């Protein structure tokens, strides 16, 4: 039975390595094999994951690997660095009808609501503005949130995977990123090596 389980494990890891290759990620090195094994292990828990690494190393692919191993639908991704703060907030939290000028008359569901029991991938988390750092920390602590303009709390059941190419430890020391949020995100730390370090 153990031998069969080991064969199945190797097969699933190889499937993930092929997935890396499909996305032009060099995936046959020992380092990437270890990452595939790590993705399998962390797929069975709901803890928050913080993925670090240079731009283009495949942080989003690692998130997809977690989803595949867990047998869950693909994640909902949002980049924290590409949107103005007010728009990013409404995308994450949603809003009630008439919450602000120009708001949809029927309101809007945000990513925390749309994700359900799935996975939210917060890319470029190091770009998150200070006010939203506070709000995200509260969501992770309480596992609930409020739509903009809302008074009724809503459950946040999704798993959060965050990614950055920045040195968040350094930014915590400098005071530009909240220490408490960093520790909430960094429950399972994953560092993806740069391409130049992936020897076959």
Model-derived regions: residue spans:
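Nucleotide-binding/hydrolysis machinery
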Residues: 4, 11, 18, 22-24, ...
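Conserved post-Walker A coupling segment in P-loop NTPases
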Residues: 24, 37-102, 113-129, 194-199
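Amphipathic alpha-helical protein-protein interaction surfaces
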Residues: 31, 44-47, 141, 177
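Short, conserved clusters of charged catalytic residues that mark active-site
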Residues: 33-34, 104-107, 120, 163
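Helical "lid/switch" subdomain of P-loop NTPase nucleotide-binding domains
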Residues: 62, 87-91, 96-99, 104-111, ...
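Loop/turn-to-beta-strand initiation segments
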Residues: 116-119, 135, 156-161
């Amino acid at each position: 039975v153990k031998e069969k389980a080991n064969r199945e494990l190797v097969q699933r890891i190889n499937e993930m390595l092929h997935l890396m290759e499909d996305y032009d990620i060099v995936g046959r090195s020992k380092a990437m094999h270890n990452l595939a094994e790590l993705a399998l292990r962390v797929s069975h828990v709901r803890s928050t994951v913080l993925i670090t690494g240079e731009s283009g190393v495949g942080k989003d692919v690692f998130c997809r690997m977690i989803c595949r191993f867990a047998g869950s639908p693909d994640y909902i991704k949002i980049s924290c660095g590409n949107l103005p703060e007010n728009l990013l907030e409404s995308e994450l939290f949603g809003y009630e009808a008439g919450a602000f000028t120009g708001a949809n008359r029927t309101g809007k569901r945000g990513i925390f609501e749309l994700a359900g029991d799935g996975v939210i991938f917060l890319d470029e988390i190091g770009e998150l503005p200070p006010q939203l750092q506070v709000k995200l920390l509260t969501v992770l602590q309480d596992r609930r949130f409020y739509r903009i303009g809302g008074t009724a709390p809503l459950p946040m059941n999704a798993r959060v995977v965050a990614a950055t190419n920045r040195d968040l430890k350094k930014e915590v020391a400098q005071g530009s990123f909240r220490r408490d949020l960093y520790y909430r995100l960094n429950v399972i730390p994953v560092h993806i090596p740069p391409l130049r370090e992936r020897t076959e």
